[in-house]
Amino acid sequence: MVETAVILAGGEGNRLKPLTEEVPKALLKVAGRELLYRTIKQLQDVGVKNFVIVVNKKFEGKVKAFLKEHNFEAEVIPNEHPEKENGYSLYLAKGRIKGEFAVVMSDHIYEKAFLEKAVEGKGLIVDRLGLYINKNEATKVKCEEGRIKYIGKNLEKYDGFDTGFFVLDESIFEVAEEALKEQKKLTMSELAKRAQIPCTEVSGYFWMDVDTPEDVEKAKKYLVKTAIKGVGDGFISRNLNRKVSTRISPYLVDKFTPNQLTVLTFLLGMFSALVAYFSPALGGILLQINSMLDGLDGEVARAQMRTTKFGAWLDSVLDRYVDFAFLSALAMHLKPSWDFMPWVFAALFGSVMVSYSTERYKGAYCEDAYAVIKELRYLLGKRDERIFMIMIFTILGWIKALFVVLAIITNLRVILTIYLVWKKKGNV
């Protein structure tokens, strides 16, 4: 596996203007994060430790400031002739690298699963399927006996698409040097063909190059769409809430931080509790809207690569406030008799304990309960399901029945959770 990567960021980004008038393409934000940040962090996640970044000379200062701001260690090489293309940019790294290394374009976005396989390949990483790209615009590759034979956008017969990711060794610099003696410009495609480097297929994963403003929007939508929670969502979240929130997140991901969205949805939840005291039906509808928006902070955090333990903790704490406040407001509106109060208290404490039981598991065992104890995913009573139930019952005016049902479902779920945790971890 390679431990060094050369990131080519020496171009001028003409097709992205006016977005690249003041910043280099590598520092352009897509879904709230700079392309260069995404590239470095994701390569670090798959084992790359050393970075060499070739940048346009006029943006050298901005790139160095960016690296310092984010505590990234990298050697920066200025390219005073960006018009000589990206093959020349790679040549500038000659003498700075030993052994095998990866080469990646700064304007490409890859999913982690792609990178995990790509760093184990050789030569040009080729995608046979090209599921997420414009195939007419993409650079095509024809391989013969495992090596590049032809490469270009206009090939009629080809084996796959150039992903912009290479795994090379020092011999590539000799080929580049010979080529530059014969010509003034050198692209990576020309260099790859001239060196007849190997082809390695990695197909079916997301990757794309961000070449135009339209590409920025396309990449943003994909990053948000794939930023939903892996496990733990209930039936309503999977089939309703996330279908709504993932359509809203692309409009917010460049404007808000995750914690800002956490606070805003908390305020909406508390407002729904206030409304519920006067109008339970309207309050229930507002609470369901709040539930549909509650995933925005997590989606934005994952799309922006800003997930933090504090953010998850804050979201969990504020959700408990909303749950308790809303049911308390309903109880005050109901003005229950003393003999009904046990149902009210059981519903209140049960609703809080459902979430507390799984959160406390995470604190005790340092792992997600839903990922380890799969039976928990199918137990009725998760927060999204309770809120949807609250909306239905309040619209129908069945407030007393709501407290009874919540009391039974939530506390039964907690009892079953205790049993399942004991069964899985009782001896730990």
UniProtKB/Swiss-Prot annotation:
Annotated membrane topology: Multi-pass membrane protein
InterPro entries: CDP-OH_P_trans, CDP-OH_PTrfase_TM_dom, CDP_ALCOHOL_P_TRANSF_CS, IPC_transferase/DIPP_synth, NTP_transferase_dom, Nucleotide-diphossugar_trans
Catalysed conversion reaction: 1D-myo-inositol 3-phosphate + CTP + H(+) = CDP-1L-myo-inositol + diphosphate; CDP-1L-myo-inositol + 1D-myo-inositol 3-phosphate = bis(1L-myo-inositol) 3,1'-phosphate 1-phosphate + CMP + H(+)
Main location: membrane
GO biological process, any: phospholipid biosynthetic process
Assigned EC number: 2.7.7.74, 2.7.8.34
Gene3D superfamilies referenced in this protein's UniProt entry, alphabetically: 1.20.120.1760, Spore Coat Polysaccharide Biosynthesis Protein SpsA, Chain A
Cysteine disulfide links: none
GO molecular function: metal ion binding; nucleotidyltransferase activity; phosphotransferase activity, for other substituted phosphate groups
Keyword annotations: Magnesium, Membrane, Metal-binding, Multifunctional enzyme, Transferase, Transmembrane, Transmembrane helix
Name listed for the protein in its UniProt record: Bifunctional IPC transferase and DIPP synthase
Organism name: Aquifex aeolicus (strain VF5)
